[in-house]
């Protein structure tokens, strides 16, 4: 069966969307062609850029699926980069509504589409745990009439406007309902595709730049070393030609057992076993209880094995140790939203394999920590047991106190569905820079400033004088209102202040 990418390539969509194929006087705002073009472009981008692979969902494995949050990331980046709506800010929530529209019109479907045997109206979820699959239709052009193929983007968009159900509320109306109106510019620049290496380097650079905005770092050495590292393009796993049949059989038996149990806990645990060495997997398989219905014994066996493995290996977040402290400090100060974005940026810098392994482990930790799940230890809360056993598998930073480490680990567990999303701010920065590179402009000029803003000498002098004066007034006010100082100490300190800054003193107290 051909992959999504192969089928999209067979449609020659890059030529279809090239400037040579646009009609004279083309404008995105034209009806209905303009919206048809936009939707066709969105569908093409989603089909060719979202990662489609075999995934597990609701205790079963499904082929050719993609994650909801990644679909939002792809469409979000595409809309901003191509500026169909000018320079208007596009909230992530509105991109979710675009995905909902695509699912309503059968561009893709949820996996599965039924819950407990009943039809349920599909609702798109911006989550790393929600899976979707592109829909297929009978190939009417085939003489056999038995083959299936994906809708082409052009056929999808055309069908959206021809459907009688949509005439009353066309996709143009959807844009307006989203408070997004297509730009009237007749020049919508769909430039040549950049190389994956260039795109990865831009993502790396801007992720680090955005991280520096959010986290106060005493030293930049770790970030600079991270920036010097060449971003690796995810490569498919190489299958060994010589597979140990015994190990392969043991892993297959464990997966089959998990699929037969319909238990989220077991499903998450078995997914983690993929990263355990063969010897440990064989030991687990051979140590299975004789009574297959004793899931409590199975869970105890799996939890002990996974905990033992991760307690003896390097932590998954062993990079950018200075950032750990910065995120923990944000959490201590109650800045949860900023801490979440900083965490998303930190995880974006992980390589593909470590990121996927960490996602599976964090998901298992969140499920196992649920108080309604299998009791891990009789006298301890599940949440505390998971935190104690897996903390060092995530962060082992000597410069981070135990309290801050615990706070960071619990925060990751509580937000495991959100920490792997890409922040909208980063999306916009990267898209603007990639667009500038595509158009041959200076990317640093168009992408705005990240670290500082250049000002002239006059503004610098004025800002320096004003800031110094404001801080001196704050200091004087603090001294005057400090009730802990004795009258003698206060008089002495105020006298010293008057000698150094008489103008500030008189301005505050008067003559």
Curated annotation (Swiss-Prot):
Gene3D superfamilies: Winged helix-like DNA-binding domain superfamily/Winged helix DNA-binding domain (1.10.10.10)
Highest rank taxon of the organism: Eukaryota
InterPro entries in alphabetical order: DEP_dom, WH-like_DNA-bd_sf, WH_DNA-bd_sf
Intrachain disulfide bonds: none
SMART domains linked: DEP
Alphabetical list of Pfam families matching this protein: DEP
PROSITE patterns in the cross-refs: DEP
GO biological process: intracellular signal transduction
Tissue: Expressed in liver.
DEP domain segment(s): 46-136
Family: Belongs to the DEPDC7 family.
Protein name: DEP domain-containing protein 7
